[in-house]
């Protein structure tokens, strides 16, 4: 009988935790802080094709992001259009791939991330950064085309 009561209380607590987690997630989605994504979204690069982008405007847009709120550091090489991002357990990069005719192609990808039980440890801030970068490109050119490209990556397993 005591075990049944403990299990009921445990499931009730778990239900409350899940409820508040989903509520917080839905609030961030409605506020535009994140986009609902698959749990393995970091395994894809995002490519942004936009009308000939002025590198200075891209640099300004990337510099204007609120990195403090995303718990992220950013280092930029404005001339080469390479931006490095570092979170608590991950790194990412945004760079200009090519510019031809009237289009510029940028690629954003996570280059390294740690997992726990198969899930990215800091997926929330990874999602926040991805969303912020997508919004920055759409603000520069509302007709920006966004394409997801699967990454080729290697996994290292820790014994401990």
Question: Predicted segments — roles?
Answer:
Residues 1-11:
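Feature marks short, highly hydrophobic, charge-poor N-terminal signal-anchor/signal peptide-like helices
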Residues 18, 23-46, 54-160:
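Ser/Thr-rich, low-complexity intrinsically disordered terminal regions
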């Amino acid at each position: 009988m005591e075990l049944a009561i403990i299990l009921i209380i445990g499931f009730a607590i778990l239900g409350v935790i899940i409820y508040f987690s989903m509520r917080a997630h839905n609030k961030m989605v409605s506020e535009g802080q994140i986009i609902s994504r698959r749990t393995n979204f970091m395994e894809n690069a995002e490519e942004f094709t936009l009308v000939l982008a002025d590198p200075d405007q891209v640099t300004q847009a990337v510099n204007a992001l609120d990195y403090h709120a995303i718990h992220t550091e950013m280092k930029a090489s404005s001339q080469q259009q390479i931006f490095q991002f570092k979170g608590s357990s991950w790194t990412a990069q945004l760079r200009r791939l090519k510019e031809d005719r009237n289009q510029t192609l940028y690629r954003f990808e996570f280059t390294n991330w740690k997992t726990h039980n198969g899930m990215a440890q800091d997926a929330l801030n990874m999602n926040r950064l991805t969303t912020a970068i997508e919004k920055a490109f759409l603000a520069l050119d509302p007709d920006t085309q966004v394409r997801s490209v699967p990454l080729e990556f290697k996994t290292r397993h820790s014994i401990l």
